[in-house]
A protein has these predicted regions:
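S-adenosyl-L-methionine-dependent methyltransferase catalytic core, i.e., the SAM/SAH-binding region
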Residues: 1-333
């Protein structure tokens, strides 16, 4: 078999060199790749014959590639077709590093069956795998106020109310398709000039809601902390402001010594559980952005675990509103 595993499209793992420098896979160990995707991080780590990878991915298309990895790397590679919030069920506890790449690959974006892009026609989908409902269900079944919350908080869409009102009005005539939703958004924003496509924020909101990305990330990070031993790393690459806000709070809040104040609610932790590996976020170099334009919005954060016993009630409470909005999806299951 060739030294590299062929992929359908040229794949560039984002910030690969920077991640490899941090986690030092030249020294033997076991690593957890929570978003296997097209295998870029895993393959690089497995270049060291003493390294092992356990990989997770919810996308059914990742299974085929994982079989190629199993043939090439044999017992050094193990794959689970699961969401990364389920890493808590792993028996292995000695990971050197746990890696989360929260972006979407080119293959996923241009997969018409997934319906992630507003450039395709047909039925709304946006399911990444192991989902209970689709974007079609969301747009055609939820109430106006529920849609407003999704667009406003998950897409940071300032026209959430107008868009939701038009959705309710138009769906009374027929089930709405991707083209219908794009048309509604364009009509709502016809007098605006945008650097990004007018549909970007609304489609982001639906994708986050359909795939329950907030709860996946919140509990994925908590479970990652519980899995790794002292002096091991959690590495996260984010691509939009909402997920980066969650990761930033997780990293910074638990890497500071805190004192209770009579003016503020009592905190559950007063000592550091993490050490910030990079004090400032790491972003792609101009060369990487030129080679791989979608990487331009990537932000890398890394922490090292230095203490057991963290209580994450404060973390969950911080994003309670977003988690409650996600729970609206239960009525579609």
């Amino acid at each position: 078999m060739s030294a590299t595993i062929n992929l359908e499209k040229k794949h560039f793992p984002v910030l690969l060199d920077e991640i490899i420098k941090i986690i030092s896979p030249r020294y033997s160990g076991t690593f957890l790749d929570c978003t296997f995707g097209q295998g870029g991080y895993s393959e690089k780590i497995l270049e060291n014959p003493n390294n092992k990878i356990i990989a997770f991915d919810r996308d059914i298309n990742a299974i085929r590639l994982s079989e190629l990895f199993k043939k090439k790397f044999e017992e050094r590679f193990k794959f689970y077709h699961k969401k990364f919030s389920e890493i808590k069920d792993l028996e292995t506890k000695n990971f050197k590093a746990i890696i989360f790449d929260l972006g979407y690959s080119t293959n996923q974006i241009f997969d018409e069956k997934k319906g992630l892009s507003f450039n395709f026609k047909g039925k709304l989908n946006m399911k990444m795998g192991l989902n209970s409902f689709s974007a079609h269900d969301v747009i055609n079944k939820l109430e106006k106020e529920e849609l407003i919350k999704i667009f406003k908080f998950f897409g940071e869409e300032r026209d959430a109310r107008k868009i939701s009102q038009l959705i309710i009005k138009k769906r009374s005539q027929c089930f709405l398709s991707t083209e219908d939703l794009v048309d509604i958004i364009n009509k709502t924003k016809k007098n605006y000039n945008f650097k990004i496509n007018k549909s970007t924020k609304s489609f982001q909101a639906l994708r986050i809601f359909v795939n329950q990305e907030i709860s996946e990330l919140v509990f994925g990070l908590i479970n990652a902390y519980k899995l790794i031993p002292i002096n091991s790393y959690i590495v996260v690459v984010t691509f939009h402001s909402l997920e980066d806000k969650i990761v930033k709070f997780f990293c910074k809040n638990y890497s500071e010594n805190k004192k209770n104040s009579r003016y503020l609610p009592e905190t559950k932790h007063t000592c550091k559980f993490f050490e910030l590996v990079n004090k400032k976020i790491i972003t792609p170099s101009p060369d990487e952005i030129k080679r791989n334009p979608p990487s331009r919005s990537a932000k890398l954060r890394c922490i090292k675990k230095i203490k057991e016993g963290a209580n994450f009630d404060e973390f969950i409470l911080k994003f309670k509103n977003l988690l409650e909005i996600e729970n609206i999806g239960k009525k579609l299951c």
